[in-house]
Amino acid sequence: RNINDDEILDFVAWTKEQPVHVRFIEFMPFTGNHWSNEKVFSYKEILDRVSEKFTYSKLHHEKHDTAMKFRVNGHCGTFAIISTMSQPFCSGCNRLRLTTDGQMKNCLFSKSEVDILSALRNGEDILPLIKQCVWEKEEALGGQFTSINGKPEVAEIINRSMIHIGG
């Protein structure tokens, strides 16, 4: 909010002549970024902003998509919104992340990591570790959030910063 939300319409306008797929991501809490719910420019607010100037339609959503996709009528490109905070999609997320130092995470917000690199270096089978990572996945948002009035609240995030996770 109040950082670059004034550029949303410009990015959507860019999809008119360019076959690009623009993604808007809600502000997410990570170590050091001073996140709060008040700073989140939500999925609904993004769509409200887009509808000030454009008529759009929702595109097909696959089971494990993390973004809701849209096309403005007459545009060759598309735009999408990753609504991590206002409309979490955790129940359909099938993503695993491998960090640059060989740790596997089952959620961007998860504080737990599984050491894949050491197993690879020791010639061990990594399939049990991948299964462990999947089974340890929390129900929502890495298990680090509580909900107050339907909005996720952060007590104290225990995690790497996004630049150290990759993504």
Tell where the protein language model's regions lie, with residue ranges:
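Short, electropositive alpha-helical surface patch
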Residues: 4-21, 75-87, 160-164
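Short flanking/linker segments adjacent to small metal-binding domains or redox-active Cys/His motifs
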Residues: 134-167
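Accessory C-terminal segments flanking Radical SAM cores
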Residues: 31-145
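Short, solvent-exposed polar/charged micro-motifs at secondary-structure junctions
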Residues: 4-7, 33-35, 67-74, 152-159
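Conserved C-terminal portion of the radical SAM core fold
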Residues: 1-33, 48-54, 101
